[in-house]
């Protein structure tokens, strides 16, 4: 009790290659946290490299499937996933971490901030959208998060269940 398996894999083929292992963890009722990379949130559904619907792939295999959309949500999402994997009937959970959530602010800003000299209305709208996206992605990212150890709950049988 109190232990969980953890696997971290790259997006696309890295995630899809875990399907058999995740199914085995489900059948064995083993708590397992699968952390998978994903295409940047701005590129989802736009033909980005290794952009597949990973959440749908694991919906029937995992107790929970979550995609983190902001840096501030990484720690709470991982904590919740670990609790879910270990609670009730133990089993696997999947947390998707898009690449733009994992990179430092200055790297993401440089990648998407290339429209500094936007021209015309369309350019200004695109620049505004990207700057707003960047602000939302990192909003609250540097605020302290609860990092205390998670409680370990060991289910004990009642006298009725034991049959005294």
Can you name each region flagged by the protein language model?
Residues 1-164:
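N-terminal alpha/beta PP-like core and its mobile active-site loop of ThDP/TPP-dependent enzymes
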